[in-house]
Amino acid sequence: MPHNGFDIAAPALAIAYHSGFGHTAVLADAVAAGAREAGGVVSVIAVDRMTDADWDILDGADCIVFGSATYMGNVSAGFQAFAEKTGQRCHNGTWRDKVAAGFTNSGAKSGDKVQTLVSLAVFAAQHHMHWVNLGLGAGWNSSRGSENDLNRLGFWLGAGAQTDVDADPDQVHPSDVRTCRHLGWRVALVTRQLNVGRAVTPAASSPAASSAPTR
């Protein structure tokens, strides 16, 4: 019998981000808004101000979406400091099999920010999490396109945004805000799908490593 998932609890998502000047914080709120539209219960957490309660939220979430400004072609020092505090959780498998995704913002159109998304994905992989890509085609790549297209900068691993270095946080490009909102919606939907699968298939409800072959 098909399972519609309505009897499954709403997925719990946490948006864990670092923002140096407020632009990435705007994108974090957009991801959260999209996740709520898809029925998620969302917490937004600035990782440079972590409390014990924040760590508990991350540990209990079904999904964590990571976000960082791109500085010098990689995640910010603030995000990296947070990542390095998760070492024991990585060792213990605390976040194993949670869903993950990522987003970033830079001052330049490219800014080498794909490296930031790669770093976020590798961080998630080290925690044995399931990475969700952006799920959008490229925008602004034809004569009929414009900078107002979703995914205007053409990223697939996660959401990539660009904000002028002298712009205020309320001047983050509307297309980038909508792209991050899409990411939140998509990752919440995937998380719900995974939760439904775990509910109806006992084999899917246990950590993947528990049934892994030994050599």
Residue ranges: model-predicted function:
Residues 21-23, 68, 74, 112, ...:
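Gly/Ser/Thr-rich helix-start
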Residues 73-77, 97, 105, 134, ...:
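Generic structural "secondary-structure junction" signal
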Residues 146-163:
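Short glycine/proline-rich, acidic loop/turn segments that cap or connect secondary-structure elements
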Residues 34, 77, 112, 132, ...:
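Glycine-centered flexibility motif
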Residues 99-151:
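Short, glycine-/small-residue-rich phosphate/pyrophosphate-handling segment
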Residues 1-95, 166-215:
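N-terminal beta1-alpha1-beta2 submodule of the flavodoxin-like/Rossmannoid cofactor-binding fold
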Residues 103-105, 163-169:
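Short, local alpha-helical segments
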